[in-house]
Structure formats: C-alpha cells, structure tokens
C-alpha cells in the first residue's frame, strides 16, 4: 500500500499503486453485483498491474542513489526510537534528566527487557536514543531530534547506571546533528559530546550502537561508541549532511546529490570502510513500509550480537572497543 508521504522518485510507483487500489475497489463492486464477465476481466487486469508494481518497486528500491537513501532515512513515517523500543522490547521504564540542568526530550532512555523465545534469550538492557517528532508540535517538543548538552549528559548518566548494574547498553541513533544554538554552546555542547566519547570507550558492559535513520556528525557519535556498530539499510552516517557539505564547497545546497556521492555515507560504503560492523536489511521500500518486520529483523540482530558480547570478559570488551575505534580512518604521516 502506498504511504501518505511520497518522495519524488517514488511518484511513478505511487501512481500505479493508486490505480491498483482503485481497480480492487471496482472488483469488489463487480463481485457484489454478480457480474462474472467483468469480474474475470478485472482479475486479469489486476494480476497484470500487480506484476508491473512489483517490477517497478524492485527497479526503484534496488537501485537507489546515495541521495535517495538520505531521503528515505528522513522519511517522516519511518519508525523512530520509541517505536522500536515498544515493538522490540517489554517493560520499558523511561528515566529522565541529567541531574545538572534539565531533561532533554530529544534523547530518551531507560531500562527495558529484550526477549527472544526461539533463541531462549532474555536480558534487561539500557536503551537510549534520539527521538524525533512526526508533526510540527511534536518536533518542537523533541527539538527535531537535535540533542542539547543535557541530552548527552542524561545519556551518559544512564550508561553509567547500566554499568553499575552490569546491564548492556543499546543506543539508537537518528539525528540531523547536535543542537547548534548559542545556549547549547554556553552549556558546553562540545564538552558533553567529548565526555561521552571518553566514557563510552571505557564502559565495562557490552555496548551496541544502531544507526536507524540519520547519523549526522558529533550529534550521532555522542552516543555512537560501541562494541558493535549496526546500521539499517537505508540510513546514512557522516561527518556532515549533504546539504551542509554542498553549501560549504559550492556555496549552494543545489549540489547536495553530488555531495552525497562524495561523502560515501551509506551503509554499504561504511561497511566497506570498516566503520560499521553489520547492515540490517529493510523491507523493500524502506522501514516505514513495514515497521513491525523492520523491528523484528533488528531485534534478531541485537539478540545475536548481545549473546556473543555477553560472553566476553569486561577487560577484553574495553580493549577491543578501544582498538576498534583507534584503527578507523586512514593516516599519512609523511604529508
């Protein structure tokens, strides 16, 4: 079924899906009227059109450009952190406040239980993530998923609490960046993010980070240091957004598509570069096409990764995590 929000490259598919829906309505009416000849003709037309829809859907979504994946990552109907928490976990207890200044609604977190009966797995975890809104009112409440310093300090407080009780940490990353306002700078935005990098590298519990949508710059890495970095298929992760990169290099946002290509910010790019460890496949058309399937796929991956990490010694965990991030990037000492 077509979604309410249609991206430019999805319009041909959306039009076909609308036509298919109209024909199905006509088929039901024809069946009620006992018009056998018309019903048989409509069935044949619907079958032909369904084949066209499936072919076009595969053609579009299996050949997405980097910029088109950025657009999908920003789709307003994608599942957000709280959606994943309630679909994947039980008994979520939200914990609020950084105990210094305020409670940042752009980051949510708390204890929850993740269970998988088939794998005989049940574990209490600390889950933390960026939270966006779906309309103007909720986006203002969540600050469009752009965390303030108190958001990162809240996240760190919850991580240290998890460490105290020996519980694994799962972070869900989906942000256009840390909030760049003057008030955030005055309250130590850079220090808060830097402190999180230091502390997360040394947490003596398993840490799994998942980029579920946008992974922009320091706003993402502020809760993005872990033993395993997972990324859903149509997410993006980069030091800068394509629009901002285009604005800096070409003094205009109109080169954002070229910027996206140059940044190599997709899951496939980052897996090849060794930045992430695993790609979580999305339903054809994006996570918003089937949120429940997406959540189940991610949950299965999390259970697998947690099962492996929880068998490791604490000292081994920290040592491997530090070496993992120290090895990232390319260095030229002769330049």
From Swiss-Prot:
The keyword Nucleotide-binding applies. Keywords: ATP-binding, Cytoplasm, Fatty acid biosynthesis, Fatty acid metabolism, Lipid biosynthesis, Lipid metabolism, Nucleotide-binding, Transferase. Pathway: Lipid metabolism; malonyl-CoA biosynthesis; malonyl-CoA from acetyl-CoA: step 1/1. Its EC number is 2.1.3.15. PROSITE patterns: COA_CT_CTER (PS50989). Residues 48-308 form the CoA carboxyltransferase C-terminal domain. Signal peptide: none annotated. GO terms for cellular component: acetyl-CoA carboxylase complex. GO terms for biological process: fatty acid biosynthetic process; malonyl-CoA biosynthetic process. GO terms for molecular function: acetyl-CoA carboxylase activity; ATP binding; carboxyl- or carbamoyltransferase activity. It catalyses: N(6)-carboxybiotinyl-L-lysyl-[protein] + acetyl-CoA = N(6)-biotinyl-L-lysyl-[protein] + malonyl-CoA. The keyword Nucleotide-binding applies. Component of the acetyl coenzyme A carboxylase (ACC) complex. First, biotin carboxylase catalyzes the carboxylation of biotin on its carrier protein (BCCP) and then the CO(2) group is transferred by the carboxyltransferase to acetyl-CoA to form malonyl-CoA. HAMAP family: AcetylCoA_CT_alpha. Belongs to the AccA family. This is Acetyl-coenzyme A carboxylase carboxyl transferase subunit alpha. It comes from Prosthecochloris aestuarii (strain DSM 271 / SK 413). The lineage of its organism: Bacteria, Pseudomonadati, Chlorobiota, Chlorobiia, Chlorobiales.
């Amino acid at each position: 079924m077509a979604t309410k929000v249609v991206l430019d490259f999805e319009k041909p598919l959306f039009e076909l899906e609308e036509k298919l829906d109209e024909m199905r309505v006509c088929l039901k009416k024809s069946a009620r009227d006992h018009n056998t000849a018309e019903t048989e003709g409509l069935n044949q037309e619907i079958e032909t059109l369904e084949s066209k829809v499936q072919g076009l859907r595969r053609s579009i979504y299996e050949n997405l450009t980097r910029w088109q994946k950025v657009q999908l990552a920003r789709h307003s109907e994608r599942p957000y952190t709280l959606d994943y928490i309630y679909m994947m976990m039980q008994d979520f207890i939200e914990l609020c406040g950084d105990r210094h200044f305020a409670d940042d609604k752009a980051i949510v977190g708390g204890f929850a239980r993740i269970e998988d009966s088939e794998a005989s797995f049940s574990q209490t975890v600390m889950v933390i993530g960026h939270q966006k809104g779906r309309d103007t009112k909720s986006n203002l409440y969540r600050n469009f998923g752009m965390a303030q310093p108190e958001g990162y300090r809240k996240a760190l407080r919850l991580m240290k609490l998890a460490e105290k009780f020996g519980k694994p940490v799962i972070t869900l990353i989906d942000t256009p960046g840390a909030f760049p306002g003057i008030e955030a700078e005055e309250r130590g935005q850079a220090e808060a993010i830097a402190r999180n990098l230091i502390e997360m590298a040394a947490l003596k519990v398993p840490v799994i980070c998942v980029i579920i949508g946008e992974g922009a710059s320091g706003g993402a890495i502020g809760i993005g240091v872990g033993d395993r970095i997972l990324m859903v298929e149509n997410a993006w992760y980069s030091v800068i957004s394509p629009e901002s990169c285009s604005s800096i290099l070409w003094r205009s946002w109109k080169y954002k598509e070229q910027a996206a290509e140059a940044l190599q910010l997709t899951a496939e790019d980052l897996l090849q570069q060794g930045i992430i460890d695993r790609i979580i496949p999305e339903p054809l058309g994006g996570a918003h096409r089937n949120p429940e399937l997406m959540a189940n796929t991610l949950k299965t991956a999390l259970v697998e990764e947690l099962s492996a990490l929880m068998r490791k010694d604490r000292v081994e965990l920290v040592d491997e995590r530090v070496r993992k991030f120290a090895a990232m990037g390319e260095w030229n000492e002769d330049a």
